[in-house]
Amino acid sequence: MPTSNQLLRNSRQPVRKTKKTPALRGCPQRRGRCSKVYIINPKKPNSGNRKVARVRLTSGFEITAYIPGVGHNVQEHSVVLVRGGRVKDLPGVRYHIVRGTLDAAGVKDRKQGRSKYGVKKPK
């Protein structure tokens, strides 16, 4: 607990909020180029193979982004759109690749929840 003299000398600093997506620099999405596409395993109670990509963004940051959905066509040198949003069971993965834009195609044969996976309405 500071004394009144200490508070007079220098006032209390407000608590600064940490940004959840610093690499996007305040933008809703950012474009980037994939430098590596690979598989990682999730944290303890979960298991499986999660597809992720290392992406160099136009803001200069190099980030790890999750590739959602079943199957993908993302490979090295693909240009992708990245949005914020972490993956709870993958430490260090705080971004998602947007499916159905640029080089990331939509999920094949998807009928429900299509808007999240970049799939047009079937005829």
Curated annotation (Swiss-Prot):
Chief place of localization: plastid
Record GO terms (molecular function): rRNA binding; structural constituent of ribosome
**Region (Disordered): which ranges?**
1-30
The cellular location(s) given in this protein's UniProt record come to:
Plastid, Chloroplast
Q: Which GO terms describe its biological process?
A: translation
The protein's UniProt keywords, in alphabetical order, are: Chloroplast, Plastid, Ribonucleoprotein, Ribosomal protein, RNA-binding, rRNA-binding
Please verify whether the record's keywords include DNA-binding: no
A GO cellular component annotation here is: chloroplast
Under the heading InterPro entries, the entry gives:
NA-bd_OB-fold (IPR012340), Ribosomal_uS12 (IPR006032), Ribosomal_uS12_bac (IPR005679)
**Biased-composition ranges for Basic residues?**
14-30
Q: Give the quaternary structure.
A: Part of the 30S ribosomal subunit.
Per the record, the similarity remark reads: Belongs to the universal ribosomal protein uS12 family.
Name recorded for this polypeptide: Small ribosomal subunit protein uS12cz/uS12cy/uS12cx/uS12w
Identify the species of origin. Answer: Pelargonium hortorum (Common geranium)
What gene is it encoded by?
rps12-A
